[in-house]
Amino acid sequence: MPGKKAPNGLFAARKLERKRLKFRWSQREFKRRMLKLKEKYDPLEGAPMARGIVLEKVGVEARKPNSAVRKCVRVQLVKNGKVVTAFVPGDGGLNVISEHDEVVIVGIGGPRGRSMGDIPGVRYKVVLVNGVSLDAILKGKKQKPVR
């Protein structure tokens, strides 16, 4: 006769609890968290923000059904030298940023840390330019410092 499915009895709670814990490994998010998979593949290495140097300005074509050129920049991260593409939000945002500027990037906020909306392959966005908020520069509240 094969083994019973679950222990039953007055003192079986600990055994039941331990058995349940093993099933967590079949859940995708649990497995990713325990094996630290995000930190291993993520260019930001699990951090919420990262500093980088602008290498070039690029235009990324929007996905169907939209027709636009989304303004982005190629950024080389200071901490590990990896190169990523970051979206530049705001009207005229790309005019403010020039090559060799120091920018701070954050995740763009797509599902499961992926790209957002119609911008293919872009997972990050620019928030600071030379230590000043890009939003403040675009609104005219602050001037971009010259490095």
Curated annotation (Swiss-Prot):
It holds the Pfam family Ribosom_S12_S23. Keywords: Ribonucleoprotein, Ribosomal protein, RNA-binding, rRNA-binding. GO terms for cellular component: small ribosomal subunit. One of its GO terms (molecular function) is rRNA binding. The keyword Transferase does not apply. CDD domains: Ribosomal_S23. PROSITE patterns: RIBOSOMAL_S12. GO terms for biological process: translation. NCBIfam families: PRK04211.1, uS12_E_A. Part of the 30S ribosomal subunit. Belongs to the universal ribosomal protein uS12 family. With S4 and S5 plays an important role in translational accuracy. Located at the interface of the 30S and 50S subunits. This is Small ribosomal subunit protein uS12. It comes from Ignicoccus hospitalis (strain KIN4/I / DSM 18386 / JCM 14125).
